[in-house]
């Protein structure tokens, strides 16, 4: 069988794919956890929003959750740039 043909044995499950991607870029689970934490806190505080409209409260929660994810992506990109370009140049570490 040629190497470009699909095989069911080579198909990985969702959990193994998530674990592999977590090893490749460790800030993905951080962003996901931050998103879930901010969203959970926002839904928890839904009853104590006082005079604020529900739609405005949900927009604020969404923006905070997206900010958490964007921050994690930014940190991941900075870490990747450091690992690929800065560390090998100054510390003579070979690339993987």
From Swiss-Prot:
The keyword Transmembrane applies. The chain crosses the membrane at residues 27-44, 59-81. Gene3D superfamilies: 6.10.140.1320. It is a multi-pass membrane protein. It holds the Pfam family HIG_1_N. It is found in: Membrane. InterPro entries: Hypoxia_induced_domain (IPR007667), RCF1 (IPR050355). Residues 1-26, 82-96 are cytoplasmic. This is HIG1 domain family member 1C. It comes from Mus musculus.
């Amino acid at each position: 069988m040629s190497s470009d043909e699909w095989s069911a044995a080579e198909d990985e499950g969702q959990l193994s794919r998530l674990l592999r991607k977590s090893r490749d870029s460790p800030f993905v689970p951080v962003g996901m956890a931050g998103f879930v934490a901010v969203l959970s806190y926002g839904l928890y505080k839904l009853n104590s929003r006082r005079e604020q409209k529900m739609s405005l409260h949900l927009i604020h929660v969404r923006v905070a959750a997206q900010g958490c994810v964007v921050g994690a992506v930014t940190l991941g990109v900075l870490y990747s740039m450091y690992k690929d370009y800065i560390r090998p140049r100054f510390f003579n570490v070979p690339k993987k």
